[in-house]
Amino acid sequence: RRSSDLELADECHKQGIRLHLYYSHIDWYREDAPWGRTGRGTGRPNPKGDWNSYYKFMNNQLTELLTNYGKIGAIWFDGWWDQDQNPDFDWQLPGQYAMIHRLQPACLVGNNHHQAPFAGEDIQIFERDLPGENRAGLSGQDISALPLETCETMNGMWGYKITDQDYKSTKTLIHYLVKAAGKDANLLMNIGPQPDGELPAVALERLAEVGEWMKVYGETIYGTRGGCIAPHPWGVTTQRENKLYVHILELQDKALFLPLEGKKVRKAVGYADRLPVKFRKCEGGVMLYLPEVPTDIDKVIEVDIEK
């Protein structure tokens, strides 16, 4: 019998892509899965379910995934929040996390529970918001010391909905990617596949356009960390060793102050055109003088800082 999961895993390994797997703690169809606040109209007869049976089922599935599909980069859990109106409910996560790390010690564990990280988790997830923001009302938790990730969807839905054509613009997607990098976070961008398994044409178009931008500016994103300058209304910074990439996203001026007190700037150039950018040291940092008000989706200035 064909296994689409196995075919996907094999192709990822062939292409050098780390395979991360989404795993829902919620199941709206198994009769042993306890009812939460969602999925109550799916025909399950017993609201209490049979937790021991369901927990064993989940762990058996996870064991299969972590045993038969090669190296797995991460297990990305979702659904803890389904029991948030039942404070006494115990998902028994420590045992599940320990099992994952025992089967594959290098496999990361993340959980989209909208809380501060629990023991045994390796990444902190923020849903539909950048770390430290809470515009969608799902990510009010404090930022931890763990590696960060923000997940967002390209239109309005996580799954496919034919009437949802409100896809984010290429500019919006690039800005979200850049801001995530500037906040030291990975970006997980969701696309709901069509019933036939194909990705929507407009989503592929957006991916191609972001890809074209990344061909030029990828070095300012891949392998960088959030820069030594905190995010500002004008944009963010990313950094690799002594190179600071200033991502100017919203600026209605030709001058930009960079709070680089105590740091010596050796030179500044436009990242794409490599043309010198004038600067001068001033109180508290450095002032950049751009040739014109930026109109690019992301005007990137490369600043060389003396170590």
Where do the language-model regions lie?
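Mature catalytic domains of secreted/periplasmic carbohydrate-active enzymes
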Residues: R1-K307
